[in-house]
Amino acid sequence: MKIAELLDTSTLKDLDISGLAEHSGMVKPGYGFLAVSDKLWDREKHIDQAVERGATVVLVDDSITVPPTASVPWVRVRNLSTRRGELAAKFYGDPSRTLNCVGVTGTNGKTSIAIHVADMTQLMGSTSAYIGTLGWGPLGQLQDLGMTTPNAVMIQKSLARMRAGGTDTVA
């Protein structure tokens, strides 16, 4: 996807990105990196790591000053931290629009309830999957997320992969 299409801007009209990441360790060559850390030192360290891993563009909040020596383009995005999910959904084809998504909140038992919901909907004929602390994917085939709470980009990417694999319900 062209970065200009993702951001609805004329900036960098010809720059394609092949993925998005907001965790520098998950950047692959050709990705756009969403630098959303509110701590300057962390943000700079993560940007450096993302660029080393092949990020072709860095998205930062519009309050951030772009350094004149940046080795890849930086794009300032208004309210980036609150728009992460929106941008990731757009990039990955808005997967939740065509999935039945069941969210579970609370203090205790979220993982257990989500697993039970995925299991029950599977028994009722849905092609169900889970996303959360234990990973993502169909039950019995969960893939590790690398962290207990997936970020907005990871959620959208995982939902898109599950949808492409035939899943219709995600808990």
Model-predicted regions and their roles:
Residues 1-86, 90:
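N-terminal leader/targeting and accessory segments in enzymes
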Residues 84-171:
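Phosphate-binding loop of NTP-binding sites
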